[in-house]
Amino acid sequence: MYYPVSSILIEFLVLAIVEKQDSYGYEISQTIKIVADIKESTLYPILKKLEKAGYVTTYTQEFQGRKRKYYTITPAGREHIPFLQAEWNTYKDHIDGIIEGSLRK
């Protein structure tokens, strides 16, 4: 099942992925596609945004004769994860509240 995702959730997923292991764009997109139907055209601007914000850095490495651009998390990226985790938890709590009937307007 695929769920709609916001760019902030994609940022969180990207940082969570590269926190565990350096990854290249296609690998990141395939991991996210396990739960969300995203396109590379959505992912790459977010990767660039994370790089510009200083949350990830990149390096190239050759693989089977081709260069791959790998993303690695920075200390600032690690520090940003708890904020994104809190945002995600709030979102989940609101969804659960609606489903359980405890959150209404």
Across the structure, where does each feature detected by a protein language model lie?
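Generic recognition of well-ordered alpha-helical segments
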Residues: 30, 75, 90-93
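Amphipathic alpha-helical dimerization/coiled-coil segments
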Residues: 82-105
